Amino acid sequence: SIMDRRGKDAIAVDALGAPGFAPGAPKEGFDAIPMWVADMNFPTVPTIPEAIIARARHPAYGYFSPTEEYFASIIRWHETRNGVTGLTKECIGYENGVLGGVVSALNIFCSRGDNVLLHSPTYIGFTHSLENNGYNIVHSPLVKDENNVWRMDFEDMEKKIVDNRVHAAVFCSPHNPCGRVWERWELERAMELYKKHDVMVVSDEIWSDIILGGHRHIPTQSVSEDARSRTVAVYAPSKT
C-alpha cells in the first residue's frame, strides 16, 4: 500500500534539500517519490505497533532489562532462519543500532588510530562512524568477475592487511551497497585469511532477511569454529 509520510519526520520525504540528501523539493505540481532502499515505503506489520502501543499505555518508562522471551526469540530466529545453533543468552548483547554495535566491537578489539579493513564501495555509515571514532579506514576494492559479479579480491585483502598491520575488519554480509549475498566458499576463504593474520571481524548482517529468490544468507560465524570465535555479528529488525 502507498503511505503518505509527509510531516512524520521521515528523512525520505521531509529532509529534501538537507545536506547529503536530495538538493531540493520537487517543483510545484510534482510529487516526491521515496525510492530509498534503506527506508522502503512498506508499512510495518500491524503486530509490531500494536505491541508498542500496548506497552506504552503503562505509564512507567524506567530502567529495564531484557526478558527471557527476548533472548529466546533471537536464538529461535537464528536457528530456524539461519541454521545457527549453540547460541545462548550470553552470546547476545543489545546496542543502539548496528553502527553503535560496530563501534563498540571495534573499541574492544582496537585502539584509536588503528587501521581497519573495509571493502569498497563502502556504506557511508561505516565511513562516518569509523572516522568519527578515530579509526583509519583501509579499503580493499571489490572487483567484477567475467560475469559482472562483484567479488572480494583476496590477494589485495591480504596485502592490505599485512602492509597496514590490520587486526580488525568490518565485513558487510549481504554487502551494502553492491547487494552481494556471499557464497559459502567466499566466506570460508575470507575467514581463512582473517585467521591467518589474526584479524577480528565485525560482520554487519542487517540485510540478511531481504534476499532475492535463489540465494541464501550464510552467517559469517557459521563457516568454521574459528570464524565463530573471531566474529561479532550485528543484526537489527529495522530493515524488515
Protein language model regions, located:
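N-terminal small-domain helix-loop-helix segment of the aminotransferase-like
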Residues: 3-97, 104
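Residue-level marker for buried hydrophobic side chains located in beta-strands
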Residues: 201-202
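Walker B catalytic acidic pair
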Residues: 205
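PLP-dependent aminotransferase class I/II
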Residues: 230-240
